[in-house]
Amino acid sequence: MAPGRVGLAVVLWSLLWLGAGVSGGSETASTGPTITAGAVTNASEAPTSGSPGSAASPEVTPTSTPNPNNVTQNKTTPTEPASPPTTPKPTSTPKSPPTSTPDPKPKNNTTPAKSGRPTKPPGPVWCDRRDPLARYGSRVQIRCRFRNSTRMEFRLQIWRYSMGPSPPIAPAPDLEEVLTNITAPPGGLLVYDSAPNLTDPHVLWAEGAGPGADPPLYSVTGPLPTQRLIIGEVTPATQGMYYLAWGRMDSPHEYGTWVRVRMFRPPSLTLQPHAVMEGQPFKATCTAAAYYPRNPVEFVWFEDDHQVFNPGQIDTQTHEHPDGFTTVSTVTSEAVGGQVPPRTFTCQMTWHRDSVTFSRRNATGLALVLPRPTITMEFGVRIVVCTAGCVPEGVTFAWFLGDDPSPAAKSAVTAQESCDHPGLATVRSTLPISYDYSEYICRLTGYPAGIPVLEHHGSHQPPPRDPTERQVIEAIEWVGIGIGVLAAGVLVVTAIVYVVRTSQSRQRHRR
C-alpha cells in the first residue's frame, strides 16, 4: 500500500500546484484584455522568483480578441525590458478598463486626421489647396476632384474676385463650404468656362482668360473627375477669391465652392548715404521696396556700429503703388560734416510676412562730405565769367538773366579744369554780355539730392548799342517785314484769280 499512498500524495501535490498556477493567471488577467509586453512594475503584485509565473509570457484571453490599439500602446511605451512569452490561459473578461491609460479611439473612427494636406471627404468636391500662399510671379496649381462628374455632361466655371480694401464679397466666404444652386456673386471676372460656346456674351473675362487670350494666364487640365486649375503667374491682379461652380450643362451652378489665392513678396533693400556739404548733418536713407502684403516693416539704424535710439532722428514713411508697398526710412545724424570724419551707416530691415515668418536684411554705406565751393563772377567787355573751385565731376553752371526763369544755357560755354582733390574739378563758364538785362545768376547744377542750391548773383549795366549796328538791325527787321507783306499780297492775288477762273468755268458749263 505504500506505493498507493505515495501516488495519492503526488496527485494531491500536483492539484495544489495547478491551483496556485491558475490563481496567479487569474490575477494577471484581471488587469484587462491587454497583452503585457514587459515585467510587472508593481513589486507587490510580481510573482516570486521560484514560481512558474516568473517565466510566463503575456496573458491572452483566447475567448475574446484583444484590442489592437492597446497592444500597440503597450509595445511602444514599455517601462522595462520585455519578458519571454508564456502560454496563454483562459481568464474572465474584466469589468472595468485600466485607470492608468485610457483606451484610444478605434481605428474605424470617421474623424479626419489632422495633417498638412486635406483628406478626401465623401462630399461633392475635394481640393488639395484651399488657401495657397505663393511668392510673387510664381505658378500656382490647385487640384480638385469632382464627385460624379463623369456620370453627366459636366460643365465647370471659375470666377475671380478681388481682395482689395472694398472686396465685392462681404463677409468673407467659408472655404470649406459647398454651396448648392447658388449663382456666382456679382462683381467677379470669369477666368475659365469648360463650355465657352455657351458663355453669356455679356460676361466680363479676366485679363489673360477667355478664347484668344495671348498669353493665357489661366488653364484647367486633367481628365475628369480631377481638374487642375493653373494660374501662370501670381500677381496683385491675379490673387483673390476664386469661385468654382459646376454641374450639368443645363445647370452649371448646381454646386459651388471657394478657393483663396494669396500672394507675398519680400521687400528689396537699398541704402543711399547722402553726400553732405561741410556744415550739414550726415544723413542716410534706407528703402524697402515693392513688398506685399502691407505687413509691418521695422528699421534699426546704426551709426558707426552704435544703434540710433532717438526717434527724433528717424523719419519713416510708407507709400502704396500698384505693385505693392514701399517704406522709406531716413536717419539724420547729430554729427556735422567737416567737423568729424565721414560716418558709416547700417540699416537693418525686418519684414513680417505673417505671425511666424519674417525676412531680415542689412545694408551698409559711407556718407561723404563735399567741400563748399567758392563761386566768383567777373564781367569783361563782351563776356561774363563764373568760376567754382573743387566741385564734383559732372557739376556745371546754369545761367539766368533778370526775371527770366529760362536758363540762357545756349549762349554759355563751360570748361572744367583739374583740382587738387581727387574726384573734384574746377568749373568755369562764360556768357556774352546782355544788352537787355542787368542781373546775372550763375547756378551750379548736378549736385546730389539734398545739397542746397549753390549760386552767385551779379549786376552789370547793359552797354550802349553801336548806332551803326542798331541801324543794320533795324534795316534787317524792315526788310523782313516787307518780304512778309509782299508774300501775303501774292497769296491774296493768287486766291482772287483762282476764284474768278473757277466762276467763269462754271458759267461755260451751264451754257
From Swiss-Prot:
Keywords: Disulfide bond, Glycoprotein, Host-virus interaction, Immunoglobulin domain, Inhibition of host complement factors by virus, Membrane, Signal, Transmembrane, Transmembrane helix, Viral attachment to host adhesion receptor, Viral attachment to host cell, Viral immunoevasion, Virion, Virus entry into host cell
Record Pfam families: Marek_A
UniProt-listed PROSITE patterns: IG_LIKE
Membrane-topology annotation of the record: Single-pass membrane protein
GO molecular function terms attached to this record: complement binding
GO biological process, one term: adhesion receptor-mediated virion attachment to host cell
Glycosylated residues, chain numbering: N42, N70, N74, N108, N148, N181, N197, N362
Principal subcellular localisation of the protein: virion
Location(s), subcellular: Virion membrane
Quaternary organization: Interacts with host complement component C3b; this interaction inhibits host immune response by disregulating complement cascade.
Protein name (Swiss-Prot/TrEMBL): Envelope glycoprotein C
Organism listed in the record: Human herpesvirus 1 (strain 17)
